[in-house]
Regions:
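N-terminal capping/small domains of soluble enzymes
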Residues: 1-107, 148, 156
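Short acidic/polar active-site loop segments enriched in Thr and Asp
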Residues: 54, 165, 220
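Alpha-helix-loop-beta-strand connector modules within alpha/beta enzyme cores
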Residues: 73-101, 182-220, 226
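Glycine-rich, proline-tolerant flexible connector loops at the mouths of alpha/beta enzymes
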Residues: 57-83, 104-117, 168-194
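Non-globular sequence segments
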Residues: 105-164
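Active-site-adjacent beta->alpha loops and helix N-cap segments on the catalytic face
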Residues: 117-129, 133-142, 176-209
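Short beta-strand segments
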Residues: 25, 103-105, 170, 223-228
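Active-site glycine- and acidic-residue-rich loops that bind
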Residues: 35-36, 149-153, 158-160, 192-205, ...
Length: 231
């Protein structure tokens, strides 16, 4: 057996049959005007599937919350036109024999005011910080937390409905979920801050809400990392 045989062999992951173990990681492209996946996005992902990638994880796609986005021209996963755009991407990838999952994204405190189309909306953060010691963002209430959990669950449900094969939840790189996990940016004194278990509660509730929407046999992926862009 060569060193590449295992990498290129098929694998079944929680009922998801992949042609090989090559996974394309998410990469933001900023190529979706009006936050709608376009012909260019369709072709971009189609080519990766045609090249033989076993599983494509899309660029971060923002959930249905007013402060989810922090960058221009990134795709969203809510709204009729945007979901129709993603369906075209999914269909193109499937036509090439590939599998694809969206990365559901909320940037949290990394959002700055002025980013279109939401404009003058603050970044949302567990303790009003985009990095330790700098209180310069909006501090989320428990009602806000509930709204974001619901937005992730809705994104997972809609992703499954348009034909995605799995869903990845972005919990890494200093964005909102990571801001809750990180003691440096989570100084809350309620049920979502303090101990590691409490700091992880928000993430756990998002995963549970998504699971409730997609069912027990649909693959869910949680991405997390030690590295943060604030490092």
């Amino acid at each position: 057996m060569s060193s590449h045989d295992t990498l290129l062999s098929p694998v079944n992951v929680g009922g998801l049959q992949l042609n090989n173990r090559v996974v394309m990681a998410p990469m933001t492209r900023n190529q979706s005007p009006d936050n709608v996946p376009t012909d260019a996005n369709v072709e971009y992902y189609r080519k990766r599937a045609a090249g033989g990638v076993g599983l494509i994880v899309t660029e971060g796609t923002c959930v249905d919350h007013i402060a989810a986005s922090g960058y221009p021209n990134v795709p969203y996963i809510h709204g009729e036109d945007r979901l129709a755009g993603w369906k075209r991407v999914v269909d193109a990838v499937h036509a090439e024999g590939g599998k694809i999952a969206p990365q559901l994204w909320h940037v949290g405190g990394m959002r700055k005011r002025g980013v279109a189309p939401e404009g003058d909306v603050d970044g949302y953060a567990p303790s009003g910080m985009n990095m330790p010691g700098k209180v310069n963002r909006y501090t989320m209430t428990t009602s806000d937390i509930d709204d974001v959990i619901a937005a992730f669950a809705k994104g997972a449900r809609d992703a499954k409905a348009v034909g995605f094969d799995a869903v990845e939840i972005h919990g890494a790189h200093g964005y909102l979920l990571d801001q809750f996990l990180w003691e440096g940016t989570n100084q809350r004194d309620d049920g979502y801050g303090g101990s590691m278990a409490k700091r992880g509660r928000f993430v756990a509730e998002i995963v549970a809400a998504c699971r409730s929407e997609v069912g027990s046999d649909f693959p869910l992926i949680l991405r997390w990392s030690q590295w943060k862009q604030q490092d």
